[in-house]
Amino acid sequence: MNIVETILTPILLNISQTDKWQRDFLIELFKTLFSRQGRFNFENLTRYSKYNELTHRRQFSKYLDWLSLNKSFVDFNSGVHIGVIDCSFISKSGKKTFGLDKFWSGVASQAKYGLEISVLACINVTTGKVTFLDATQTPSGLSKKEGSKYSRTDFYLEQILDCLKSLPTIVYYVADGFYAKEKIINGLTSNGKHLITKLRSDANLKYLNEKPRLKGQRGASRKYSGKVDFKKNGISDLSKWILVGLDEKYPHLTIYTQKLYAVNFDRIFGVVLLLNTKTNKYVLLASTDTKLDARLITKYYQLRFQIEFIFRDAKQFMGLNDCQARDENKLDYHFNASLTAVNIARKAIQQDEIYNKSMNNFMRYQYNRKFAETIYYKLSQNDEFDLIQSIWLQAPMWGNLVT
């Protein structure tokens, strides 16, 4: 049995609302996706799959609970997990594709015309292993301004809230500075979750007044004892900050922490200041959980960048940018299938040392196996052909990289 079947069969049997026909199609889809050459689109899939183009189009229109499927790759009992959310730009030309709009491209460092997907993943804090969970395409025409009736911020929050019930053990969600919005913060905290994010370098923050109330003092006590003063070359005064020490992973970073009132959010954050001793520049991280240790806030935010490796593998190996469909449902199916394929491939690489922990070797092995099987089944019709077991076992290893 192919390793893809070994991994997927028990997982798909536990997912509700999937029949045998859909399970068989998914197994064949991922086997084809791993063993193909060229783009991940309907026309090219037909060249390598036993299903025709019409079958692929019909199946891509059907609903599938991708979150339940991908949750099966996570052992939530193996340690603390954090949620990570980020967006990825997808290049797409034309005028009729659903969701076409101007979105930010990190590679180009500017807004470009194309598609965008909002991706939710989880990371094991102990091992640093990241697992894709769910992807949703951002619709076009949504306002970028937070004060609008329904903006992109509302859409991103909606995706997170839809997944919360399925992820009860995840308490902390980590996102970059774009997600430092009042709606997202309030949406998470009202559901018993916390957000760790990045603040602007000139964030409007105030120190809390920790002085005891004087005997016989009239009126209410002062809540705050002054504004945090930021200068162009760094923070001017660190005397009111608590020195935690050097970062374990990056010794040139010094960690300071303090509980501060954020004026724009009207709430108290546990704020971490990371001071780069080489450049004298700093970064501000914030957590809605004011009791969370500063080192953990730093570690969780550093782990956030693991989601970029999912985007890298999906675009480089799994054809994330290759979809030729224009329909909303087909696009959603393609994006989730491409990102789910990364989970399956990593699971296979973890189980078998033959791939040398290399995604490139895994893809090459699957293609070579498919190629060798095709030749064998064609030649096996001839009675004079005998399979040499040693050569057959070596065939899928052609061209593998050695680590």
Predicted regions mapped to residue ranges:
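An internal, acidic/charged active-site-proximal segment
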Residues: G141-G270, N356-N360, L401
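Short, conserved catalytic/metal-binding motifs centered on acidic residues
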Residues: L45, G79-S93, L120, Y173-A180, ...
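Electropositive nucleic-acid engagement tracts
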Residues: P10, N14-K95, R222-K227, N360-S380
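Electropositive, glycine- and tryptophan-enriched low-complexity nucleic-acid-binding patches
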Residues: N44-R47, G106-I170, V263-L284, K291
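Long, charge-rich low-complexity segments
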Residues: G79-V84, Y377-T403
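Short amphipathic alpha-helical "interface-anchor" segments enriched in bulky aromatics
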Residues: F89, V228, A294-A325
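Active-site-proximal, Lys/Arg-enriched surface segment
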Residues: T55, F60-K129, L133, V244-D247, ...
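Basic, amphipathic alpha-helical segments enriched in Lys/Arg and hydrophobic/aromatic residues
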Residues: D322-Y376
